[in-house]
Each structure stands twice: as C-alpha cells, then as structure tokens.
C-alpha cells in the first residue's frame, strides 16, 4: 500500500488550520449553490482552493487546489497529465442499517449501495472525459474509509471494499492509496500535477468532518439519478 507523504511546510500549515479559520475565506458562487463544493482564495497561496463536500464531485483544468476532509467516506482523485485536467469525488455507500451493511459484499453489483458508488465514480470519470481526458491516460489515487467507532466502522470498511473492487473491475490505473485505518484525514490534491497530500488527524479535530458526513448520510436518496452514466466493463 502506497501512502502519500506531506513534504512542504506550507502544506503542513494548511492541514493544521481549523475549519473555523478556513470558513472566513469562503466565497460561495452561484454555480456552487447545490453545496457540492465551494471555492475561496487561500491567504498564503496564489491559487483558488476548492473544498469538495460529502456527496460532491469537482473537476477542473485550472490551477487550483482541491481539498476535503474524510472520515468513513472515500475520495478518488483522478487526472490526465497530458490534458492537465483532474478532479475529486467524495462519497460513501448508503446503508439503511447495520444489518444491511454487514451483509453487503463488493460483488453485489445490482444493490442500491453498489449502484450509488458506481454512479459517484462514473460522474467523476465522465466529467474528466468531457474535458478532453482519455480514459487510458487517467491515473487514480484513493483515500479515506476510516474505521470509526460504532456503526460507522462498518461503513468505512465497506467503502474501502467497494472502491478497491471497482478499481479492479474497471481496470483503473491506481498509482497510490491511503485507505482504512482508525483516523480521519485531511486531503489536498493538485489536479494538474496529480500530487496529493494527506494528513491523519485526531478525533478532537475532526468534529466538522464527522458532522458533514452524518448530514450527508442521512440525506442520501438511494434512487440513482436518471442521467445516463456509462459503466466501463
């Protein structure tokens, strides 16, 4: 298992910034009204920063930094180095209860949970393809799926099982991953260069992440959106 390391002091400083400090820099725009992401100017970086919220997906050809916080959820970072486009999603599998999560398995392709996960992955991939990326050139880095206490521990485990099985089945070029474990993460991604930085954080600093994911989990409608999505076999 490959783990992405943080090597630049500015990245460390940013990762340790509290969500309350970052919140003062939030500048919502009209296209962000759905709440999937928001963009702001970082005080010590010349680029725009975009935070992807649970259930969101964001792809860009601009020089930006995409970031998110991950508890039980997983994120796939994908990019085409030649076209200089990249993006990130942030999702979890929807389960109605602990019994359902215990009996789900990655090969249950027709289950609502698997279909939701496939949709989250295909939205990211198709969005990059629409921006000129070639599927054969796409590279992926996978993050998240922490085994948190209680019911959420099963959710994190199942999210990891799903994303690994999906990557294997669809023959995705996964070049790095940092999955599982017992701690939430903060994740930064440069979509043009394909560089990613991850910092595991303590539970005392992860209240906002946990709250966002709980709200997302309660709001998930397991009816897959009607938009046509191509599943690559």
From Swiss-Prot:
Keyword Isomerase: no
E.C. no: 3.5.1.44
Tagged with keyword Thylakoid: no
Catalytic activity annotation: L-glutaminyl-[protein] + H2O = L-glutamyl-[protein] + NH4(+)
InterPro entries the record matches: CheD-like_sf, Chemorcpt_Glu_NH3ase_CheD, Cytotoxic_necrot_fac-like_cat
BP-aspect Gene Ontology terms: chemotaxis
CDD domains: CheD (cd16352)
Keywords of the record: Chemotaxis, Hydrolase
SUPFAM superfamilies: CNF1/YfiH-like putative cysteine hydrolases (SSF64438)
Coiled coil: none
EC primary class: hydrolase
GO molecular function, one term: protein-glutamine glutaminase activity
PANTHER family in the record: CHEMORECEPTOR GLUTAMINE DEAMIDASE CHED-RELATED (PTHR35147:SF2)
Protein's job: Probably deamidates glutamine residues to glutamate on methyl-accepting chemotaxis receptors (MCPs), playing an important role in chemotaxis.
Family as reported in the entry's similarity comment: Belongs to the CheD family.
Listed name of the protein: Probable chemoreceptor glutamine deamidase CheD
Organism: Vibrio cholerae serotype O1 (strain ATCC 39541 / Classical Ogawa 395 / O395)
Lineage: Bacteria, Pseudomonadati, Pseudomonadota, Gammaproteobacteria, Vibrionales
